[in-house]
């Protein structure tokens, strides 16, 4: 059975924290690949102003192109409405019955697991992999695999704020993503 990691998110923008998490889990669990799963509309971010999927997808392609064990999974982009992990993983497990999926989440999402849509059924489809994130614990009533990663306290919201305030973001995200953001005037207001 193939072992594939999945890291979902809005990736608005993708940054070195995402890549670090994916790479650390890839090596720690001896995965075949890690798939980045951009969300169409995350249920917990409905109503928030999110960069277009076309731009987020392009930035994600730029961020992951150098790593042959990273791929982008477009499963959620064809659906309208909120992107529920259960619906996505149900589709993926049917499409890839020979794959054991490891769904990678940060400490913030580990704490939020009891509120996830159809969580009990989802636990039958994936193995959750929790990674520590500053300010969050990995305590949950559910069985998860934990992977220790070097602390890298950067988030997409921090980067959007830094761009808005015209602060440097060098060394926080891949240079090609940074150039794309600056050329297209993303996150300026």
Swiss-Prot record:
The keyword Cytoplasm does not apply. It is an enzyme of class 2 (transferase). Pathway: Cofactor biosynthesis; NAD(+) biosynthesis; deamido-NAD(+) from nicotinate D-ribonucleotide: step 1/1. GO terms for biological process: NAD biosynthetic process. Keywords: ATP-binding, NAD, Nucleotide-binding, Nucleotidyltransferase, Pyridine nucleotide biosynthesis, Transferase. The keyword Transferase applies. CDD domains: NMNAT. It catalyses: nicotinate beta-D-ribonucleotide + ATP + H(+) = deamido-NAD(+) + diphosphate. Its EC number is 2.7.7.18. Gene3D superfamilies: HUPs (3.40.50.620). Pfam families: CTP_transf_like. InterPro entries: Cyt_trans-like, NadD/NMNAT, Rossmann-like_a/b/a_fold. Disulfide bonds: none annotated. GO terms for molecular function: ATP binding; nicotinate-nucleotide adenylyltransferase activity. Catalyzes the reversible adenylation of nicotinate mononucleotide (NaMN) to nicotinic acid adenine dinucleotide (NaAD). Belongs to the NadD family. This is Probable nicotinate-nucleotide adenylyltransferase.
